[in-house]
Regions:
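Von Willebrand factor type A / integrin I
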Residues: 134-135, 149-180
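An amphipathic, basic-hydrophobic helix/alpha-beta surface used to engage anionic
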Residues: 1-101, 136-143, 149, 156-160
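Feature representing long, continuous alpha-helical segments
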Residues: 65, 104, 108, 124-127, ...
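Glycine-rich loops and low-complexity Gly/Arg-rich segments
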Residues: 42-45, 65-69, 106-111, 119, ...
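Short, flexible loop segments at the rims of nucleotide/cofactor-binding pockets, characterized by
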Residues: 19, 115-119, 147
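Short secondary-structure boundary/hinge segments and terminal tails
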Residues: 92, 128, 178-179
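Von Willebrand factor
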Residues: 102-138
Length: 180
């Protein structure tokens, strides 16, 4: 809740503050403030599965592009953004960027993110990430897996992460597989 403003036709009726309106001769509506200063970490699995091309571009490149766009929006909204890349061990952890002027720093760091021929170690990577985060964060995890064993290991690691953080798991859809 930020402030009260005079109700105008077309506003959502659920925003009317009936107690404040009862004290005056006009209707007043609540104005809510957007949450700011959230910590968002874009985590990238740089393992072998992320090298598979989707429409001619590796999955990791599509993930990085999507994350940079979302990071720019988050920075404009007043949130803090970091990048984290891993394969068999953590490879990249940027400090949190705090405003949109720092987006070039994130772009430079993102340019170093590339896939490797190694299998990802979700347990080590996500435990390292958890240890580095001092407060509750939103973690957007870009990954893909081809076999049930990898999926189980990833789910176990994410379960531990979810105890303290919000986690969104993102995969890049392959249109060719969807058509089958």
């Amino acid at each position: 809740f930020e402030a009260l403003s005079e109700y105008e036709p077309g506003m959502d009726r659920r925003r009317i503050d009936w107690k404040a309106s009862a004290r005056h001769t006009r209707l007043y509506a609540r104005e809510n403030e957007s949450e700011r200063d959230n910590q968002i970490v874009f985590a990238f699995d740089c393992g072998q599965a992320m090298c598979e091309p989707v429409d001619g571009l590796p999955r990791i490149d599509r993930a990085v592009s999507a994350a940079l766009m979302a990071a720019w929006v988050a920075l404009k909204g007043g949130d803090r953004v970091a990048l984290f890349g891993f394969a068999d061990k953590p490879e990249l952890m940027t400090p949190f960027a705090t405003d949109s002027r720092a987006s070039h720093r994130l772009q430079t760091a993102a340019a170093s993110i590339d896939y490797t021929a190694r299998e990802p170690n979700f347990t080590l990577a996500l435990a390292t990430l958890t240890a580095k985060l001092k407060r509750r964060s939103l973690i957007v995890l870009f990954s893909d897996f081809a076999d049930p064993t990898s999926a189980e290991l990833m789910v176990e690691s994410v379960e531990r992460l979810v105890r303290h953080h919000l986690v969104i798991f993102v995969t890049v859809e392959d249109a060719e597989l969807s058509d089958l």
